[in-house]
Amino acid sequence: MSHSDYTRRKFLQHTALGTMAAALPGFTLAEDRPINDRPDPAFKPDVEVELTAQIAEVSILPGANTRVFQYQGQLLKGPSHSLKTLPGYLGPILNLEHGQKVRIFFYNKLSEPSIVHWHGMHVPQKMDGHPMYEIYKGERHVYEFEVENRAGTNWYHSHTHEMTAAQVYQGLAGLITVTDAQEQKLGLPSGEYDLPLVLQDRRFTAGNQFQYGQGMHQRMMGFHGDTILVNGQANSAIPVKSRAYRLRLLNGSNARIYKLGWDDGSPLTAIGTDGGLLERPETLPYIMLAPAERVEVWVDFSGRKPGTELTLQSLEYQGVMSPMGGRMGRMGMMSGLAPGASFPIVKFQITEQVSDSPSLPNQLVPIRRLTEKDISNTGKTVPIAIGMRHMSFELNGRTFGMHKRMDIEKIPVNTIQKIRIFHDNQMMGGMGGMGGMGGGGGGGGMRGGRIGMMGM
């Protein structure tokens, strides 16, 4: 879609932003859009990265290459490990440290608007990749923030209004890892023994091109693919040594929920989730992972002989709710590989016997326990009702408005609030905005027939 297709709409949408943008350092106005295209000279970054969204062609399946959207990265300043490129089409991994100051220059070389959201990172509002800050082809946006997160796994992805799900499906996503002093004392597996695993399911045309949801219903409700990709690659097999590894798993799928388990029935050992490292390791028979969720798993291949394999799979499960209510059996939601079916995800092939391996700590990091005494809004719980009407998702009965908010949605910064989040119908979706990858509607119209959830 061309730049001119948005001019009238954006003029009406962003007129009110002029005064605000002029007051913010580094912000300029482009057709009454707030564009943060200049670095703040007072901000002294420890890490500086250039990130470019562009079209690329990559080999995923045998035969023709697949056309994708891709983040290309370049490290301008900082430790060499701050940026790590993965094979496949996903963006580079950003490896950051607590307390670092980070500057990222985002360039858009796509023919449609885009903006980047740092999912799970604690950053100022104007650095979070809100859709109001989207940029067009040939423009740039400058992000500057200090890393306040504790050690854990996060990610970044497109956050363009009504295009989020489609752009992520095409490839605009990547991992972020954060480390801190507490984590470094634990001696967890690192370097080549710290493995990122981005799980995605995709549909392909006969010509090996991504096939995004067909029709309004699939784009609104999400859909399942029939090919499982790990780090952008099909039929994934990873060579490992007979020692302990740290697996960082992200569900980057459109709508699929995985029930993670080992093919030999061994339990899983979780050491971290979306919020970071756990207080202590948790041993579980399986782990459910919804779209946008992350989990960190400790796996020890010690005692396994070279030539053997261990497969991480999605175990069979029942009881999936269809988007319009009612239970589903083994028929897929919007076709594709059936939800709840059992299938392999990635094989780990033991190729080398080694004797040195770290031990799993009994304790990881202390976590402060919150109580009712910590809450600032005692007796005034904030309600967030998730619903749907007229094919648009709603929060508290309202569709998304770029600059509109209810009084109850204004939360004082640095306070602990009690919030009740609930569904007022039977729609399915994970926390953190899923729908998010599930293609849920941001509310009020479409761009080119593609709808994306705003809650990511």
Regions found by a protein language model. Give the residues of each.
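Histidine-centered copper-binding motifs that mark active-site loops
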Residues: 4-6, 15-16, 29-302, 318-320, ...
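Long intrinsically disordered, low-complexity regions that are acidic and Ser/Thr-rich
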Residues: 434-456
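Extended hydrophobic-aromatic, low-complexity segments
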Residues: 258-260, 308-311, 321-323, 393-396, ...
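Hard-cation-handling environments
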Residues: 314-315
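N-terminal secretory signal peptides
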Residues: 1-10, 17, 21
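C-terminal substrate/ligand-recognition segments
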Residues: 383, 388-391, 404-435, 455-456
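A Trp-anchored, charged/polar loop motif used as the substrate-binding/catalytic surface
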Residues: 229-233, 400-405
